[in-house]
Each structure stands twice: as structure tokens, then as C-alpha cells.
Amino acid sequence: MSASEPSEAGEPKEPQARQLRNGIITLSVLGVLIVALLFAVPGLHGVGRVVTRMTPGWLAAALVFQILSCVGYILIFLLVFDRTPALFGARVALTELAFGSAVSLGGAGSLAVGAWLLHGRELSLGEIAERSAVLFLVTTLINAITLVLAGLALGIGILPGPTDPLLTLLPAGLVIVAVAALLALPRASERFAMARGTGRRAALARGTSRSIRDTRAILLRPDWRLVGAFGYLWFNIAVMWACFRATGYTPPIAVIVLAYQIGWLANVLPVPGSVGVLEGSFVGMFVLYGAKATPVAAVSVVYHAITLWITLTWGTIAFIRLQRDRHRHPERRAAHEDSAESRAGGQ
């Protein structure tokens, strides 16, 4: 019996649904604890006061920016999974965002649920794995481009803010080296695959090479949906910028970009929603770049709340709709799975 089929007791065994539900419950508890700490711990009273005095208009703008960020992810998802029907693909994209927020598996949770939902939609598991890698690489490279531009602009004094090379040119240089190594990987992977001939490692090397080449092709091919990759990141940064505007204190834009992107690395830790972890990482990075700790702490909490709950709400609704469709049309799903398996067998 598969995980998505009904059990003998009539209860659907849906580990994905259970993971999402448990993640949301955990996030709710952690969120309540953080809010309680802000108002109960004397040293955090200043943060709580900043939060309560934020300008509603700018918070509304932050909500709009987060919705636009989600739309950006939908667009780049549909560009990468170009054979996926638009409505179905949009729901899978939103579900991935929700799982990435709620399930304590870092980014692996969102990719896993995306593969589970896509399997049988005329896509083999191998195709899904390669396309998922392309999606990850496209969004990662957009992050890299943005960080390099901000770091160089800040380091050479084009944009206002600290010019310490360790905080500006060093991060940009490390990212440039990493991107160069990534772009050189296809040739090395193909040589490795040729030396190995056949086997799992050779197949993995060939798949890696194809994913990187496909990523490069997507980034260089004119397609209006590519703006989604930029919008996904830039509107998310705009959420934080709007939250700063709501406090009346706004660090230089390049500082926001760099501190946001480096601080976001804490999101890889397997903590549901990175609650507490991400806020601490943001505060540390912004203070390192010279920002004031109290407004940064307030902005970090509000930013995280906005991004989490819009993503979770929209993504959970999309997941429920997908689940209903799966159970309503099991024969259609079986036909798609047979088609995908036959295509995979013929490759």
C-alpha cells in the first residue's frame, strides 16, 4: 500500500500532510513563546515597544511584497518545470514554500514534497530530480549575483555603508569563486562519468552536468518568467526593508541586502521555520554591519512572522487543493504514473 492510499480503517496515510500539520503546530508554539519573551523579559522590552509602534502602512506594504515574492517563485517554478500545467504547478510551488517554512529539514523538505506531488505527472523521478536541481541552482545563482553586486558596490564606495573589505569584498570574492567552480563542474563531471563508464556514480555525474548546463541555458534564454527568480529574492528583501521603514530607522540598502543574505544561511539548520535561529542570525549580521540592535531585533521578528505566515497560509491552502484532487481522480494519477514509468523505461 502506498503512503497516499487509504488504510483499512479508512484513514489516509499522508506523511506529508502530517509533517506540515506538525510543523505548523510547532511554529505556532514557538511564535507564542517568542512574543511572550519580548514582553516578559526586561531586556527585551525595548524590542516589544518598537514592534507595537511600527507604522501600519509600511507593514501592509511588507505583506504585499511577500505575496509578490511567492508569485515570483511560482513563475520560476513554471519556467523550470515547463511541461507542468500552470495551475497545478503554481500549487506545487506554493506547497514547496510552505513545507520549506514548516518542516524541520532545511530546504530538503520542500524539494521532497515537490517531487512527491510531481511524480506521475508525465515526469520520471530522474527528470524531477534534475529539474529540482535546476530550480535550486537558478535561485541560488540569483542570490549569488545579488550578493556580489551589493558587496562590490559597498566595498568600493558606490553605495553608502561600511567599506571594510572583510564585510564587503571578501563575501563577494568567495561567492565569485564558488560560482566559477560550479560553472566548471560540468566538464569535470563528464570526465568522471567517462572514466567510470556505467554505474550509479557515473549516472549522478551526468545528471549533475545536465542540471548545471540546463541552469545556464535558462539564465541566458530570454523568457519573461525569469523575472520570477529575481522577484522571489528581491521582494523578500523588500519585506525586510519595509519593516525597517515601519520603525523609522532604515540601514543603507546594501547593508540590508548583505546582512539579509548572509544571515539567511541560518535557515539551513533543521529547526521548524528557523524560529529564533533566523532572528538571532539577522541581529548578529546587522549589528556587525553597524546597524542598531533594538530596531533590527524588532524588524527580524516581524519580518519572519510576515514571511512565515503568508507562505504557510497560501501554501497550506494549495496543498489541501492538491490533496483533494489526488483523491478525487486516482485513475488519472495512475494513468500519469504508467506514462511516466514507460517513458523512463524507454530512455
Which positions does each model-derived feature cover?
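Membrane-interface alpha-helices at helix entry/exit sites of multi-pass transporters
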Residues: 91, 109-111, 120-137, 290-302
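Transmembrane helix boundary and interhelical junction motifs in multipass membrane proteins
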Residues: 69-77, 104-115, 254, 267-283, ...
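Membrane-embedded alpha-helical segments of transport systems
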Residues: 99-103, 127-148, 298-313
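Hydrophobic, aromatic-rich membrane-embedded alpha-helical segments
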Residues: 91-119
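Hydrophobic alpha-helical transmembrane segments in multi-pass integral membrane proteins
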Residues: 272-274, 280-304
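Transmembrane helix-loop junction
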Residues: 82, 101, 120, 245-246, ...
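Short amphipathic alpha-helical coupling elements at transmembrane boundaries
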Residues: 49-53, 116-120, 130, 210-217, ...
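Predominantly cytoplasmic-facing regulatory/coupling regions of multi-pass membrane proteins
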Residues: 1-96, 143, 153, 157-268, ...
